[in-house]
UniProtKB/Swiss-Prot annotation:
Residue positions of the active site: D89 (proton acceptor), D264 (nucleophile)
Residues annotated as binding Zn(2+): C302, C304, C307, H333
Pathway connected to this protein: tRNA modification; tRNA-queuosine biosynthesis
Keywords: Glycosyltransferase, Metal-binding, Queuosine biosynthesis, Transferase, tRNA processing, Zinc
Protein name in UniProt: Queuine tRNA-ribosyltransferase
Quaternary data: Homodimer. Within each dimer, one monomer is responsible for RNA recognition and catalysis, while the other monomer binds to the replacement base PreQ1.
Cofactor-binding details, from the entry: Binds 1 zinc ion per subunit.
One MF annotation (Gene Ontology) recorded for this entry: tRNA-guanosine(34) queuine transglycosylase activity
Length: 374
């Protein structure tokens, strides 16, 4: 993987990630394909929304169907028939989400398989081996996602273990002679001094890109913005920056303003299945009765298949009838909305007009523009 930085506007960056499998224009949003599929969508449909890279979930794919099944096909790209780049998370976040079902030790994490109850062990080395078999274009190190709230002492010990695991991830990745990219993950909770130690430690180890982890886990938005403003300038300028698990459209805008290049989140797909649809001026809850006789498109500014062909009344009808097509059409729209937002941000950065774009964006959804600290 190669990262090219074209231009900047304030802290925002316009560039691209270059892989053997294709080019990803940045800032970029990655749809989430947890089980090797973006729910309800074919790879061709996902591509038509404008997505150039997907996220796959190491933890879930390892437990089901397993590495060996995917290796029968080649790798994850061949298994799911997505021929563009794929980033896979390390499995750390899912393991730590298991709560009482897992035990964290220096060597790794022991836990019960949530599918069948079997005892399972996942370590930095094992995560690197799984992601190697998946053929991931971007491999994520195995880390502990520090929960929120966490006091300083816990956040410190968690961050320090993540740094040790980062070194072990790097070593096993290199032993496998993996020619793809490996990203480090910056931890430290909401504590700037701990984030400083994490960034320095990861940069000293050396990675192809750097993710900001442990945000969007319940902390106030002000804390997320503060940590991004503190951390991003410390990441080498020639490396991509990835904000994990984020987020709402305004979170993408705020991340870009602070120097983030890559995002992923289940929100556009999950919300689509629940009838919450993102439009230029906010959110449409298509389940509401007021849409039952509305012949207008979901979003007059949107060029997606759904908005070109169907009315709000039809989408309301499908949702109320719990029709599968409704979830599919909603997902097509939400993913296209996110990709249109990213394209708008990229164009605004190119033209040096990002803050005008931001003001217009917030004006349309009726919210004030969050301040940028110097």
């Amino acid at each position: 993987m190669k990262y090219e930085l074209d231009t900047t506007d304030g802290r925002a960056r316009r560039g691209r990630l270059i892989f053997e499998r294709g080019v990803v224009e940045t800032p970029a949003f990655m749809p989430v394909g947890t089980y090797g599929t973006v729910k309800g969508m074919t790879p061709e449909e996902v591509k038509e929304t404008g997505a150039q890279i997907l996220l796959g979930n190491t933890f879930h794919l390892w437990l089901r169907p397993g590495q060996e099944i995917m290796k029968l096909h080649g790798d994850l790209h061949d298994f799911m028939q997505w021929h563009g780049p794929i980033l896979t998370d390390s499995g750390g976040f899912q393991v730590f989400s298991l709560g009482a079902m897992r035990k964290i030790k220096e060597e790794g994490v022991h836990f019960r398989n949530p599918i069948n109850g079997d005892k399972v062990f996942l370590s930095p080395e094992k995560s690197m081996e799984i992601q190697y078999d998946l053929g991931s274009d971007i491999v994520m190190i195995f880390d502990e996602c520090t929960p929120y709230p966490a006091d300083w002492d816990y956040a410190k010990s968690s961050m320090e273990m993540s740094l040790r695991w980062a070194q072990r991830s790097r070593q096993r990745f290199d032993e496998l002679n993996n020619k793809n990219a490996l990203f480090g993950i910056i931890q430290g909770g909401v504590y700037e001094d701990l984030r400083d130690v994490s960034v320095k430690g990861l940069v000293d180890i050396g990675f192809d890109g750097y993710a900001v982890g442990g945000l969007a886990v319940g902390e106030p938005k002000e804390d997320m913005h503060r940590i991004l403003e503190h951390v991003c300038p410390q990441i080498p300028e020639d490396k991509p920056r990835y904000l994990m698990g984020v987020g709402k459209p305004e979170d993408l805008v705020e991340g870009v303003r602070r120097g983030i290049d890559m995002f992923d989140c289940v929100m556009p797909t999950r919300n689509a299945r629940n009838g919450h649809l993102f439009v230029t001026d906010g959110v449409v809850k298509i389940r509401n009765a007021k849409h039952k006789d509305d012949t207008s498109p979901l979003d007059k500014d949107c060029d997606c298949y759904t908005c070109r062909n169907y009315s709000r009344a039809y989408l309301h009808h499908l949702d109320r009838c719990n029709e599968i097509l409704g979830a599919r059409l909603n997902t097509i729209h939400n993913l296209r909305h996110y990709q249109r937002l990213m394209a708008g941000l990229r164009e605004a950065i190119e033209q040096g007009k990002l803050e005008l774009f931001v003001a217009d964006f917030y004006g349309r959804i009726g919210k004030p523009v969050p301040p940028l600290n110097a």
